[in-house]
Amino acid sequence: TVPPTLVAFGVTTADSRKVLSPEFKAAGENIYYIPGQALAQEIDFDLIKSNFAKFEAIQADHKVTAASAVKYGGVVEALALATFGNHIGATVTLENLETALTAQLGGFVFTSPEDIAGVAKIGQTAADFTLTVNGVTLDGHKLDSAFQGKLEEVYPTEFAQATELEEVP
């Protein structure tokens, strides 16, 4: 059975060479963070526009290999999701751990093999599939299982395959 599903599409024009996916691509790359506004009743559109302009300028001047907007799970969620795709880990130090799981508007986490001035470098990607935040190490396989496990009942990825072919009239 298929659960009730809403499918929506957004269309825009963009140079496909500048479109980035969120997953980390290689070990040893620098991880950068542009903090956004904590989710609040009032939206600081000037900060959000400034962050987008800053990220666009960085992307124009430097090699950016992966990027993700910080969403409802905060910067730690963005980092965890970035490790899942290619099972590349990360070691980061966050100054404000109290708000690391707070939803944000207009924040970005991105990676680059280059040193980039004027933006907060929070860590590096790592070959081992772990996420280390301020010295606390989380196993990437356990994080990924916990993340995917909550969706397994709705969108199963494992099922018993029928061994007999049904007759088609």
Locations of regions flagged by a protein language model:
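Carbohydrate-binding surface patches
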Residues: 109-111
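Intein/HINT protein-splicing elements and their conserved insertion hotspots or analogous self-processing inserts
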Residues: 1-102, 113-169
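A structural-propensity feature for long, helix-poor, extended segments
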Residues: 104-106
